[in-house]
Amino acid sequence: MNKEEILEAIKNMTVLELAELVKALEEEFGVSAAAPVAVAAAPAAGAPAAAPAEEKTEFDVILQEVGSDKIKVIKVVREVTGLGLKEAKDLVESAPKPVKEGVSKDEANQIKAKFEEVGAKVEIK
């Protein structure tokens, strides 16, 4: 399997399948996917003034407020992230907290819509 075939397979995966893939890669290689995202975001902060003219391509979805129906919000967190029940509950209870990082604008808006349907307040950065 070459690089292009791998990328094509990843493009055809659902968000849940991608979350499972990331978790499997983390376990297999003993790494954390969170570290490279933070490192990749750091150079943008020190970029020259010309950089802000570029359109942002990666967005973070941050759960700001849970709203009145915490159980439905936990279900959406599990659906979006692929987290287990306890991890999703902990994330919801520690809001404001990033739910998904480094996603496309379309995906971020879809995630935001899912949370707003269940009464949660979400911010896209």
Swiss-Prot record:
One of its GO terms (biological process) is translation. Keywords: Ribonucleoprotein, Ribosomal protein. One of its GO terms (molecular function) is structural constituent of ribosome. InterPro entries: Ribosomal_bL12, Ribosomal_bL12_C, Ribosomal_bL12_C/ClpS-like, Ribosomal_bL12_oligo, Ribosomal_bL12_oligo_N_sf. GO terms for cellular component: cytosolic large ribosomal subunit. The keyword Transmembrane helix does not apply. Pfam families: Ribosomal_L12, Ribosomal_L12_N. Coiled coil: none annotated. The keyword Cell inner membrane does not apply. Homodimer. Part of the ribosomal stalk of the 50S ribosomal subunit. Forms a multimeric L10(L12)X complex, where L10 forms an elongated spine to which 2 to 4 L12 dimers bind in a sequential fashion. Binds GTP-bound translation factors. Forms part of the ribosomal stalk which helps the ribosome interact with GTP-bound translation factors. Is thus essential for accurate translation. PANTHER family: 39S RIBOSOMAL PROTEIN L12, LARGE RIBOSOMAL SUBUNIT PROTEIN BL12M. Belongs to the bacterial ribosomal protein bL12 family. This is Large ribosomal subunit protein bL12. It comes from Thermoanaerobacter pseudethanolicus (strain ATCC 33223 / 39E). The lineage of its organism: Bacteria, Bacillati, Bacillota, Clostridia, Thermoanaerobacterales.
